[in-house]
């Protein structure tokens, strides 16, 4: 499972990387969006957070942390053999995340989870994401979550519902 997220404040980002590592993410990709507030990140610090979390959770590997990439480039290069769970508070398809994801359970499918910046994605970005192949749009509920909370919740749901 991959995590794609918009960079956030250092303390919250460190916490998000720790939780993502504990939840078994294999790759972490910082993604710059229109509303991203933090434009430069220290990937070395993120790597150290991942090492610490891997040790704590008795994980034998450490997720690969990619260089940051802009959303458009990420979507243009998105692998055809991997689905992208797109989490956004504006999605209202009348279904819960469980109802949306459970029918997609297939152990051969590879997954990525996309979490946007605080403030969400721009209208243009929402259109771009919606037009991308293999995107599964989900809502994480009625409440607007902080990015680090949304990362933990979404990864747990995908892992429990799909990745087993």
Language-model features and meaning:
Residues 108-128:
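A C-terminal functional module that forms or caps the active site or interfaces directly
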Residues 41, 95-98, 147-151:
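Short, charged, surface-exposed secondary-structure boundary motifs
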Residues 87, 92-95, 115:
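Reductase modules of NAD(P)H-dependent flavoproteins
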Residues 123-164:
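Structured adenosyl-cofactor binding patch, chiefly the S-adenosyl-L-methionine
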Residues 19-23, 101-104, 128-131, 154-155:
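Short, solvent-exposed amphipathic alpha-helical segments in soluble enzyme
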Residues 1-86:
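RNA substrate-binding interface of SAM-dependent RNA methyltransferases
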Residues 91-92, 118-119, 142-145:
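Short, acidic/turn-prone active-site loops that include or flank metal/cofactor-
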Residues 74-80, 97-106:
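Short amphipathic alpha-helix with an adjacent loop that forms part of the alpha/beta core around
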